Amino acid sequence: MCIRDRGKTNWGFFASTKAAQRILAESIAREFGPRGIHVAYFIIDAAIDTPRTRPLIAPDKPDEFFAKPPAIAEEMYRVAHQDPSTWSFRVELRPFGEVW
């Protein structure tokens, strides 16, 4: 799983680890996919709305800025139960209030 993988100014130190994470997930998916094991790579490009996160990261942001944990869990559940004929690998989640 990944928190963010897009390039961003002043975040170059973070980019190499995220690229490595994605490539590792691809390798695992190719190794285990033929055995019927679905590997998906999730990018959660958002501040996740928790009691601790909101006051620390963005106390003045509206609700639309945050990803809700139940919505993230629903999407992960949906992907985990996909038909093998239409498996997703890379799934990006972000709230509509996020600037990207």
Regions found by a protein language model. Name each.
Residues 3-20, 26, 30-33:
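Catalytic loop of short-chain dehydrogenase/reductase
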Residues 4-6, 45-48:
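Active-site segment of SDR-like NAD(P)-dependent oxidoreductases
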Residues 10, 51-55:
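Short aromatic-enriched loop/helix-cap "lid" or pocket-rim segments at secondary-structure transitions
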Residues 21, 25, 53, 72-73:
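A general structural signal for well-ordered alpha-helical segments in protein cores
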Residues 49-50, 100:
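A short beta-to-alpha transition loop/helix N-cap that caps and shapes the active-site region
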